[in-house]
């Protein structure tokens, strides 16, 4: 008995358990069925019908801002179908940007304004280039002096070149040329006795040209080599 009592104290729920049965709504007893309470009773409808309806034709004042945005009509756009404010603001900003690009400020097309800005930028850059030229070369009218060549050579202007040619034509100078034996073999100068003075300059110029070309482009000639060996 003592062990049984100890067991009962240890496991009280095994002895105190109850059987639970659930009844379907159809099998409920008739006294449990109660009429559903109506939200609007007869008194509500009677008061509604007795209320004066003289102000139904008076239009309710709606601010113009709410009229423009259709905020006064909550049934027009339900809350479930509206996009979030971020998307609405993003679309609005994009639309405004496109309108500005198409129209431009001051009712000027955006392409025309872009072209004018580009031309102004080109004029500004050209002005900077002209200022740098004036700072480097002096005035814009004066032509810049050409730098002198290295090793003491100078560039002759056109007027100086023509002056030198005229002096050579009026005062012919006797030029001496040293002719090597190889040059004599390539070309032997011959002048008649009476026309030595008149053909001297032309023959000497042709002599220098032939010797220069012969030195630049030497041609292998076995007969000339034999003559050089005999000499």
Swiss-Prot record:
Main location as per UniProt: nucleus
Highest taxon in the source lineage: Eukaryota
Pfam families: INCA1 (PF15142)
Record PTM Phosphothreonine, positions in chain: 180
Induction details: By serum starvation.
Short motif Nuclear localization signal, span: 90-95
Listed GO CC annotations: cytoplasm; nuclear body; nucleus
One GO process term, biological-process aspect: negative regulation of fibroblast proliferation
GO molecular function annotations of the record: cyclin binding; cyclin-dependent protein serine/threonine kinase inhibitor activity; identical protein binding; protein-containing complex binding
InterPro entries per the UniProt record, alphabetical: INCA1
Cell compartments where the protein resides: Nucleus; Cytoplasm
Keyword check for Cytoplasm: yes
Post-translational modification: Phosphorylated when part of a complex with CCNA1 and CDK2.
Start and end residues of each stretch annotated as Interaction with CCNA1 and CCNA1/CDK2 complex: 75-99
Keyword tRNA processing found: no
Effect of gene knockout: Mice show increased CDK2 activity in spleen with disruption of the splenic architecture.
UniProt keyword list: Cell cycle, Cytoplasm, Nucleus, Phosphoprotein, Protein kinase inhibitor
Subunit structure: Interacts with CCNA1. Identified in a complex with CCNA1 and CDK2. Interacts with ZNF16; the interaction inhibits INCA1 activity and induces the cell cycle process. Interacts with SPACA9. Interacts with CCNA2, CCNB1 and CCNE1. Interacts with the CCNA1/CDK2 complex. Interacts with ING5, DAZAP2, RNF26, USP15, SPOUT1, DPH7, TRIM26 and RAB5C.
Family: Belongs to the INCA family.
Job description of the protein: Binds to CDK2-bound cyclins and inhibits the kinase activity of CDK2; binding to cyclins is critical for its function as CDK inhibitor. Inhibits cell growth and proliferation and may play a role in cell cycle control. Required for ING5-mediated regulation of S-phase progression, enhancement of Fas-induced apoptosis and inhibition of cell growth.
PANTHER family with a match to the protein in the record: PROTEIN INCA1 (PTHR37341:SF1)
UniProt-recorded name of the protein: Protein INCA1
Organism: Mus musculus
Gene: Inca1
């Amino acid at each position: 008995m003592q062990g049984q009592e100890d067991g009962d104290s240890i496991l009280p729920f095994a002895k105190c358990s109850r059987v639970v049965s659930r009844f379907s709504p159809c099998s409920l007893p008739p006294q449990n069925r109660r009429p559903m309470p109506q939200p609007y009773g007869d008194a509500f409808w009677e008061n509604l019908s007795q209320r004066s309806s003289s102000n139904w034709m008076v239009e309710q004042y709606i601010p113009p801002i709410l009229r423009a945005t259709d905020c006064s009509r909550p049934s027009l756009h339900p809350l479930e179908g509206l996009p979030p404010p971020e998307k609405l603001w993003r679309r609005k900003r994009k639309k405004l940007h496109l309108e500005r690009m198409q129209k431009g400020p001051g009712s000027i097309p955006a392409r025309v304004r872009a072209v004018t800005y580009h031309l102004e930028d080109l004029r500004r850059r050209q002005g900077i280039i002209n200022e740098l030229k004036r700072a480097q070369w002096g005035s814009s009218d004066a032509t810049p002096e050409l730098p002198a060549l290295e090793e003491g050579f100078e560039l002759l202007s056109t007027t100086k070149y023509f002056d030198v040619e005229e002096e050579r034509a009026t005062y012919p100078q006797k030029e001496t040329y040293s002719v090597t034996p190889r040059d004599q073999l390539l070309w032997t100068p011959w002048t008649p006795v009476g026309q030595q003075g008149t053909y001297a300059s032309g023959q000497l110029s042709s002599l220098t040209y032939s010797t220069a070309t012969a030195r630049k482009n030497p041609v292998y000639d076995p007969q000339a080599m034999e003559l050089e060996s005999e000499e």
